[in-house]
Amino acid sequence: SLVGSEMCIRDRGWTGYSFHGRKDKHSDFKWHWYHFSGTGFDDAQKRSGVFQIQGEGKAWSEGVDSENGNYDFLLCNDIDLDHPAVVSELNRWGKWVSNELNLDGMRLDAIKHMKDQFVAQFLDAVRSERGNDFYAVGEYWNGDLEALDAYIEAVGHKVNLFDVPLHYNMFQASQEGKDYDLRDILKDTLVEHHPDLAVTIVDNHDTQRGSSLESSVEDWFKPLAYGLILLMKEGYPCLFYGDYYG
């Protein structure tokens, strides 16, 4: 059973995955309802929403972003990162893909919705196979420097983060033009406070026009913005494919 925002209901959620076509080649793990903490669709009543799975030990994860009170759930089926079997399976896949593709690092998407201690131990697990210099950058989309600082502390400085506050400073500068004080362009940014952990960006796939986090830096300012992140000593600059190729 699931619980909605107002009452406990009986629901049909699509939470069973057996992967018959794999024939257990890479994994014999089968996903069941108890490997998830929530779902975004009630098939019984054909409605979308946020439905929390009920059961022993079931709850939204702690160590996630505080937006909306608790931002564990994002969409579709929310994986339960407190379940030991889930943690073990994800760690195993992390090691597998890193070895199979001979990776030097990886980007972790939407980590504000993942339990911070899961991310920390996941990187420990992968680095146990690939070495301590295995690189990781996380997309923690929050423009508040204090939130990014707190996350960095929580995961023990084990992951770099995209400098979201810097992006928003650049967006503001491109909007205000001559009225913007360029002395503030690095104010309250990750690269100012944690230059060794900041991945500096101008735009990305989520900030471009028509996307979910639309805040596209105006075209006239982009050469200046890229000149800054590519030429300054601090931070690891990241060039957006869409800006380079159009």
Region locations from a protein language model:
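Active-site-adjacent "subsite" loops/lids of carbohydrate-active enzymes
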Residues: 54-100, 111
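Active-site-proximal helices and loops of the catalytic beta/alpha 8
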Residues: 10-37, 92-246
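Core domains of carbohydrate- and sulfate-ester-processing enzymes
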Residues: 11-72
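Short, mixed-charge, low-aromatic patches
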Residues: 45-53, 72-82, 179-186
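Short, small-residue-biased leader/transition segments that mark boundaries at the very start
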Residues: 2-9
